[in-house]
């Protein structure tokens, strides 16, 4: 994905849910994009989150943009750490079941800005 240097929005030109390796029994996943902003002077973090996205393994490829709530702006002296979280689940009608199998939950640090 590409991260915008000004507003930290995350964009996939072609986001394909079917390309993910779904654990046994999983039918859907939830994707969380967040930005950790670290201030070394005060040794504090502020966290910004985009709305959680849910996709099915049956969904098709799409252009996907995630924007952060609260509108962080880049400031000198702060460190910006974009992070993706992923959680697989099984959805049967109205019922949802968390998947606790191997590789059912993941987190990825996308670097430092």
Q: Can you say where each PLM-predicted feature lies in the sequence?
A:
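Long amphipathic N-terminal alpha/beta scaffold segment
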Residues: 1-5
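Structural beta-strand segments of beta-rich domains
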Residues: 6-10
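Short amphipathic, basic-aromatic surface patches that mediate peripheral association
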Residues: 13-24
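Eukaryotic short linear interaction motifs
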Residues: 18-20, 40-43, 94-95
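Short acidic alpha-helical/loop segments enriched in Asp/Glu that coordinate divalent cations
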Residues: 22-29, 44-48
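Internal, hydrophobic beta-strand segments that form the core of beta-sheet-rich folds
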Residues: 28-39, 76-108
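Intrinsically disordered, low-complexity Ser/Thr/Gly-rich stretches
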Residues: 36-54
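A beta-strand/beta-hairpin structural motif
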Residues: 48-75
């Amino acid at each position: 994905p590409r991260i915008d240097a000004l507003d930290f929005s995350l964009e996939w030109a072609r986001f394909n849910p079917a390309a993910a390796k779904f654990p046994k029994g999983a039918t859907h996943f939830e994707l969380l994009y967040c930005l950790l902003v670290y201030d070394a002077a005060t040794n504090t973090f502020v966290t910004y989150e985009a709305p959680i996205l849910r996709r099915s393994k049956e969904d098709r490829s799409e252009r996907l943009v995630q924007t952060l709530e609260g509108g962080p702006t880049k400031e000198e002296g702060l460190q910006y750490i974009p992070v993706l979280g992923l959680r697989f689940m099984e959805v049967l009608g109205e019922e949802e079941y968390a998947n606790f199998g191997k590789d059912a939950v993941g987190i990825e640090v996308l670097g430092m800005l």
